Amino acid sequence: MSVRATISDSKSDFHKEFPYVIPAIYRKLADELLVELHLLSHQKNFKKDSIFSTGLKEVFCKFTSGYKPSEHVTKLFDAICNCNGFNPTEINNSSEQLVSNAKSFTKEDLNSFLSKTNNDNKGYDYYSRINAIGIYKLVSEMPLFKEVKEEDLNKEINDISKSLGYQYSRVEKDISMYKSNIEKMKQALEIIALNLKTK
């Protein structure tokens, strides 16, 4: 019988694969994603699908904006995934495929995709906030919703959430927090850049 890995095990594996200092502004992201993926790796009713993969990539890319040295970004993502048993290549490919498809999705295509996702995920109904970001990214990439009002976009997110068996109130809250944190991160990076210029 295999021994269940602890969060300490995951962190140890992470630092072995990524033996670099993480700039302070990005440290919280790395730690939160590492812990989140560790918890998900032990959830029997969680399944890594394309919406989750898209959400994970979106969160990581948004919150590593401006990361230096830039050549460490891919290594950081790979280490966060690998130390928790997630295959970074599979996640990248799954995310890229969905985002690419979404750019030409019609409403019928979306419904077909959601129906297939539901069928594939039967018995796996665990919700992660990363799924919420995946839904938001999916809708944001669809031409159908590029010019709609925010209330109409929210209605679509509500419909998608319900079709996937998620509570819209949780999805809405997680998306709202995500947007707020992106803005805070952007402001923090602007302040850092300004301070560097004045030195």
Curated annotation (Swiss-Prot):
> A single GO CC term, please?
plasma membrane-derived thylakoid photosystem II
Annotated keywords: Coiled coil
Family that this chain belongs to: Belongs to the THF1 family.
Pfam families for this protein: ThylakoidFormat (PF11264)
Q: Report the function annotation for this chain.
A: May be involved in photosynthetic membrane biogenesis.
Does the keyword field hold Transmembrane helix? Answer: no
Organism per entry = Prochlorococcus marinus (strain NATL1A)
Q: Which residues form a coiled coil?
A: 167-198
The protein, known as: Protein Thf1
Gene symbol?
thf1
- On the tree of life, the source organism's domain of life is Bacteria
Q: Which GO terms describe its biological process?
A: photosystem II assembly
